[in-house]
Regions:
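Glycine-rich, basic loop-to-helix element that forms the pyrophosphate-binding segment
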Residues: 90-110
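A conserved hydrophobic helix/loop-capping motif in glycosyltransferases and polysaccharide synthases
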Residues: 31-47, 54, 66
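Short, acidic, metal-binding catalytic loop of nucleotide-sugar glycosyltransferases
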Residues: 50-60
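A short, conserved alpha-helix in the catalytic core of glycosyltransferases
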Residues: 191-192, 196-199, 203-208, 213-240
Length: 325
């Protein structure tokens, strides 16, 4: 059972207190918050407004936004509304992994204690960052992710704790979890979905950066498993709640024209159906390269079967809390 591993925790409530509460650590921890954005001005501003309201006792926070070629006035709006935010302008071809790497590289120059990598389509519970830092302080060599919830259905989990299953054909995602079915204490996972992840600075100095060459998008699917292979622990702290915009569901392959399908699977590296991305996520992120290769082949077989109308039976999903009891 997962519960055989002990996890150090601290008593921090997730609800925003009426008065600022002293953190459980001594002194100040320096945290750089990094987010790569493009052409989502209002969403980015909403994210920054949310960050501006969080509890920051015991924290020295710097926010770094990498704007990769926005044409909707994102840079100007950030500088006018949040002048203390550091904005780095990209060339327009960084994509998500490259943008995050540029921001992380800038953050490393100031030698913070932690780097928090976030998506901009996110709003935050008032105590989330204090919770993440407290858990990281109590558990050395640990990367900590927040509990990702849907902002339009805030009781429902957005994405959490994907598990590698070679014979299923790759990462198996949980889709039916809620705030009532997840564990109450921090719990170990195989990979962390990168919408809100706190890295001790040593994780980047030891493990490198996101794999921009192979995964211009979805770099989190490879980076946190890479750290885990190096002996880092991956935890989700369910008390650190963050609320996310639901993903846009891409059209099914069967709904695409031949040209659209070709571009999706071969040309567009940011597309959910892109096979190159899928292979590299498996090859680099699976427990072993052999498992990654076999998992990818099985994924292709499943695609072929679905194309002729053969689908596997739905699998009952247990409450995640039961697996950690």
């Amino acid at each position: 059972m997962h519960g055989t591993t002990t996890i150090e925790t601290t008593e921090i409530a997730c609800d925003r207190p009426r008065a600022s509460k002293a953190p459980p650590w001594q002194g100040t921890r320096k945290v750089a918050i990094v987010s790569a954005v493009r052409d989502r001005r209002e969403i980015t501003l909403q994210c920054l407004r949310s960050l501006d309201r969080i509890e920051s006792a015991g924290l020295d926070i710097e926010t770094i936004i990498v704007d990769d070629g926005s044409t909707d006035g994102t840079c100007e709006a950030i500088r006018n509304t949040f002048p203390e935010t550091h904005v780095i302008e990209g060339s327009g071809d960084l994509w998500c992994s490259g943008g995050n790497n540029l921001g992380v590289g800038h953050a490393l120059l100031d030698d913070p204690d932690y780097i928090l990598v976030i998506n901009d389509d996110t709003v935050f519970d008032g105590r989330f960052l204090q919770v993440l830092v407290a858990t990281a302080e109590a558990n050395p060599r640990t990367v900590v992710g927040g509990l990702l919830l849907l902002w339009d259905e805030p009781h429902r989990v957005f994405q959490i704790a994907p598990r590698w299953d070679t014979w299923y054909g790759g990462w198996r995602h949980l889709t039916e979890q809620t705030v009532w079915t997840v564990p109450e204490a921090p719990f170990d996972v195989e990979t962390i979905v990168g919408n809100c992840t706190l890295f001790p600075v040593a994780a980047f100095r030891e493990g490198g950066l996101f794999a921009t060459k192979w995964l211009p998008h979805f770099g989190d699917a490879e980076f946190t498993p890479r750290l885990r292979k190096r002996g880092w622990r991956l935890l989700i702290d369910p008390r650190a709640r963050v609320f996310n915009q639901p993903n846009e569901v891409p059209p099914k392959m069967s709904e695409l024209s031949a040209r659209e399908l070709y571009e999706a699977v071969w040309k567009k590296y940011n597309h959910a159906h892109n096979l190159r991305n899928r292979f590299m996520m498996y090859w680099l992120g699976a427990p072993t390269k052999l498992q990654g290769f076999v998992g990818f082949v099985i994924y292709l077989v499943r695609l072929a079967l679905q194309a002729i109308g053969i689908r596997s039976a739905p699998r009952r999903e247990r409450p995640l809390r039961e697996e950690y009891e």
